[in-house]
Structure formats: structure tokens, C-alpha cells
Amino acid sequence: MSKFKYTEFEKQMNSVLTHQDEALADIHFPSSDETDATIAKAEALLRSLGYKPELLKELASFHQLKKIMVVPTWKELCAEAERHVGTHCELESIFTEEELRSNELAIHQLNEEFNVVHRLDAFDISIAALAALVGAAVDILLVGIPNKTSGGLKGGPLANYIRDYFDKKFPEEEMQKLANSKVSKVPYDAQDNRHTTIRVEGLSAYYHRLLQLGHDPLLGFIFGVADILTGRMTTIDKAGNIVSQVMENYADRKESDIFAALAKQVIHFKSDVTTSMGLPAPLMSLFNLLQFGNIGEEEQTIAEIVQGMYYEGYDFIHFCSMSIPAMIVEVIVRLGYAIKRIKEGHAVKDSIPLSLNREKHPKLATMLFIAHAGATAANAGKVYFTQNPVAINYPQWIAFAKYSYGQLKWVLLEKPTLRDAYVRGKINEELDAVLAEANASFDMFAEDYIVVFN
């Protein structure tokens, strides 16, 4: 039984090929040596009788009449083949064992040709490893872990530099004036439950920005703007409850125009970004929904762990600091990839590593996956040895998740499909050459016939 599953057309093709193969095998072809010897004897006899064979050939061509050749339809070919060999023919049957092994070897070589294009060499792996090591070193030595001190939040040298930059860019006095002005007041900015109609667990001056979706740097542009337009406050409280309520006491903070609401949202972000309990990291508010887990000696849930991280200084500015190691990994890999491509002789415009399209840049996505996997593993070690969840590099884990998904999709779905297309393309190129040769042979053969197609 064949290991292949054939379509109806392929079954018909197999029957026709099997029948034609058997028909050719039944034809007795005299050896070319015998034929040449017979022709030579006939020409010698003609010359002995005073004839010139060359002239007889020219004479014969003048008197030769063209025969009629009828080409059957595909349906007729199939019917004839099925009468002789049936409908359950296997394509492998018309090949010898040696030919089948040769075919398998050819397919294996084509697969290997495709794999070589996407396989990383020592330089590719070295670039990815270097990026991972540099990113991990920056994360451990320069970003560090935020700690509350008498002088404010302090971390590694790089984290302190980023926080100082934000403080200089958004001076405390100016931000205080902005926060007290009407242009920055929003209806969702309640700091406790005094003005709420539905109690929000954990709502306080310390945690209100973590609980209110309007303060999320990403979700705020959806929920925050919507709350400004409707005069509401949308929260996910400490217990994981989603609450959306009208804030009657803050009705004067509403806006009726979406562009005015968007502008107010941006201004409010600006006024809050450098406060002692600043904006949370992007999407951090959603972790309040994760009311499960039994982590550490205190047996905390994931939501409680994240709430504690925010309290310890895991805010938007620290998120920006943590983004730098992940960015460094990206830059080193992409720059190294581009330099290597240029040295290999590729054009500069074809070496610019902006796209992750594997047909244009076969190895780039895999190199980025390896580099981010290494940097993420180092961060996991940092968290393990410090036993401090604030050491988690959130942007690095996001990058790792992104490239892991892409790599998994590539290995399981895209790579087999592209490899099959590559192999089929090569086979079709050879088939086109064979068909062109067959058509040329048929045209030459048909010169002496009147061809009729049914």
C-alpha cells in the first residue's frame, strides 16, 4: 500500500503512466548496432547496383505521403489505462528501487539547500550571544532594582540617570501647577472612596493610579479618554473587580469633544509621570485580574505581587529604564546582521534589517529570538538570586514572548510550508525543462503527420 494519499486526478495520472510504462516495456526495440549494420549492408548493395543511397533518400521524401495521427483525449487515455491496469496504481511501481532511492536523495538535498539558507553559522550565533550578554550586563549592573530612599527612588546608574532626566524634563513645581490647573483635571482621578457610589477596594493615594485604567500609559488612551467623555471612572480594584461608575462630584471635568478629551488625557499623563507614586508600567493594571497563585512565604497571589512591585517603585519611568537593555539587544543583533550581510556581498539596501520577513532576511528573526532568550534567562537568574520580583525586566519578557511566538509559528507552520514551496519550485523548474524537450520532440515527430486532436 502506498504511503501517499492521492487525489482523483493523481490516481488517473498514475494509471496512465503505469499503462504507458507497461506498453513501452512490451515494445521490442532492435539494438542500434544491428540496425546500423543492416543499413550499411543495404547501402553497400545499392552502390554495387549503381545507385546512390543519398539520391534515393531525397527521392523518397518527394513521394512520401503524410499519415494521419489521432491524439486521444485525456478521458480516452484514462479509460484505456483503467481497462488494462485498473485504478489503484502506485506511482512508485514504475520506478526501480535504485531510482526511488535516487529520488529520495534528490528531495533530501533540496530540503538541505533550503535549510542551509536559514541555518545560523558560528558568526550569527556569536552576534546573538554577544547581544544577550551585553543586554544582561546592562540590566544587572546599570538598571538594577529600584529602592525607596530619603532622596527618592534609586536604582542602578542608568536607572538613576533616566529618572533624573524625567525630573529635569518635567520639573516638580511646574508639574504641581499643571496638576492643580483645570486643564489636567479628569473625572477618573479619585484618590479614595469619598466620592464613589460603588466602593473600589484598595483605592488610595498610593494605589489609585494602578487601579484606574485611565492612568495606564496604553489603556488610558482608550478607557481614560472614554471616561473623560462620559464623566466616569473605570477601575480594576485590588480584589480583581471591574467597576465603571459615574463620578457626579467630578462632572465639571468632562469634555464633549474627543480631541479635547485626548489632549486632556495627555496633559494629565504629563502631570502624573514624575509623582512619588507615578504612572504604572503599560498594561500593569490588568494584573489586578490575576487573583490566583500562592507565591513566596506570604503565599501571595500574582495580583498582590504586582501591587507590591508598584508600591516599591516599579512605575513607568522604571519601565523606560528597563527597556534600554532590550533595545541594546535589538541594536547589536540588527547592526551585526547588517554588517555581516554587507561583507557577504549583499547590497546595502538589502542588508538593512528593519523587516523580519524571512524571505528577505532568513536568519534575523532566529538571531533575535536567541539573543532575547539569553537576556531573558539572565533576568530570570537575577530574579531567582535576589528573590525580588521588582528585578523582573518587564520589557525584556515582552520581547521574549513576542519572538518566542514568532519562532514557534515559524518552526511549526511557516518553515515547512516555505520548504515545500521551495522544493516544489525546483522540481517544477526541472519538469518545465523536460516538458519543453518533450514538446520539441513531438513537434519534430509530427512534421511527417497530420495531427488530429479529438
Residue ranges of model-derived segments:
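Glycine-rich, hydrophobic membrane-spanning regions of integral membrane proteins that mediate transport
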Residues: 2-454
